[in-house]
Curated annotation (Swiss-Prot):
The modification Phosphoserine is found at S120. Belongs to the MYG1 family. GO terms for biological process: locomotory exploration behavior; mitochondrial RNA metabolic process; mRNA processing; rRNA processing. Ubiquitously expressed, with highest levels in testis. This is MYG1 exonuclease. The modification N6-acetyllysine is found at K267, K273. Residues 1-47 form a transit peptide.
């Protein structure tokens, strides 16, 4: 009885264990999150951001945080009131301070010039971070490991962390900070369907000011979260596995053609360009790949020119100008290769009914390279 009495007394006197454990922040430095009072432990965490017109960066920052288990049920507090912001567990895109130790992630203050490169030495990206980039920098590895069902030490997490920043988050950082894609000159056409543009259109219009901004912000978070998860799924299940196919194609390139400048992909629909550029630099002997051949969904063969850069529309060596825009028999006659299907008007891709025919188109182009007008 005495022991039971003492255990009961200790249970009453000692504080209860916390209802949940907050994670340690990831990024350039690991710091403990601010401690919450016992009363706050009973309530969901609070994510603070500014009210009024919203933008893609804070919508993405809040959405990424809510994908983490510890913030899944977090309340979004949209305000500029310093007292209300002070009561929040984490604040993004407002408040005028960047202090990871206190979980304050604003980028608008004059003193803020941080980039992924400056905060994570070794990373190449030098675009000024927005609140989206800051949250991704500090929580991204943990988030991806959680979503991918693996550990942060898994090399896949590091690969996809870089891929998602370069091809998703950095764009949001740049747009929010007003950084143009072009160093000089005017763009030839408008980009109006970007993620940032679609988020902006969820704000109330000038002639309907009574629209619910809070509902619009929730739709914005849902939009950016869905796109983030879709992109991650594509990179995990399509882009990353394609690397092995490109590696195999490069290893077999001399069996395809003695020049080593033509590769054949086992599955043509795979995303090969970035992998080829990365792997090509390590080839021995060094060689530039000019053409990729593969079968399409109809079982016919395609010959695709390797672009000068992964996202470029300009080819290293386009198909001959006299072939461009022609089809079928007209193309057969001009090329001297029976069985042709088409050559695109820009010369970046063509089709043939057989593998040997596609190879003949590539070899004929290589043979004429010194006489071809190349796109500069």
């Amino acid at each position: 009885m005495g022991h039971r009495f003492l255990r009961g007394l200790l249970t009453l006197l000692l504080p209860p264990p916390p209802l949940y454990t907050r994670h340690r922040m990831l990024g350039p430095e690991s710091v403990p999150p601010p401690k919450r009072s016992r009363s706050k432990l009973m309530a969901p965490p609070r994510i603070g951001t500014h009210n009024g017109t919203f933008h893609c960066d804070e919508a993405l920052a809040c959405a990424l945080l809510r994908l983490l288990p510890e913030y899944r049920d977090a309340e979004i507090v949209r305000t500029r009131d310093p007292e209300k912001l002070a009561s929040c567990d984490i604040v993004v895109d407002v408040g005028g301070e960047y202090d990871p130790r206190r979980h304050r992630y604003d980028h608008h203050q004059r003193s803020f010039t941080e980039t992924m490169s400056s905060l994570s030495p070794g990373k190449p990206w030098q675009t000024k971070l927005s609140s989206a980039g800051l949250i991704y920098l500090h929580f991204g590895h943990k988030l991806l490991a959680q979503l991918l069902g693996t550990s942060e030490e898994d090399s896949m997490v590091g690969t996809l962390y870089d891929k998602m920043y370069e091809n998703f988050v950095e764009e949001v950082d740049a747009v929010d900070n007003g950084i143009s894609q072009w160093a000089e000159g005017e763009p030839r056409y408008a980009l109006t369907t970007t993620l940032s543009a679609r988020v902006a259109r969820l704000n109330p219009t000038w002639n309907h000011p009574d629209q619910d901004t809070e509902a619009g912000f929730k739709r914005a978070m849902d939009l950016v979260q869905e796109e983030f998860l879709q992109r991650l799924d594509f990179y995990q299940h399509s882009w990353l596995p394609a690397r092995a196919l490109v590696e195999e194609a490069l290893a077999q390139r001399f069996q395809v053609d003695p020049s080593g400048e033509i590769v054949e992909l086992a599955k043509g629909a795979c995303p090969w360009k970035e992998h080829l550029y990365h792997l090509e630099s390590g080839l021995s002997p060094p060689v530039a790949i000019f053409f990729v051949i593969y079968t399409d969904q109809a079982g016919q063969w395609r010959i695709q020119c390797v672009p000068k850069e992964p996202h470029s529309f300009q080819s290293r060596l386009p198909l001959p100008e006299p072939w461009r825009g022609l089809r079928d028999e007209a193309l057969d006659q001009v090329s001297g290769i029976p069985g042709c299907i088409f050559v695109h008007a820009s010369g970046f891709i063509g089709g043939h009914r057989t593998r040997e025919g596609a190879l003949s188109m590539a070899r004929a182009t290589l043979a004429q390279r010194s006489y071809l007008p190349q796109i500069s």
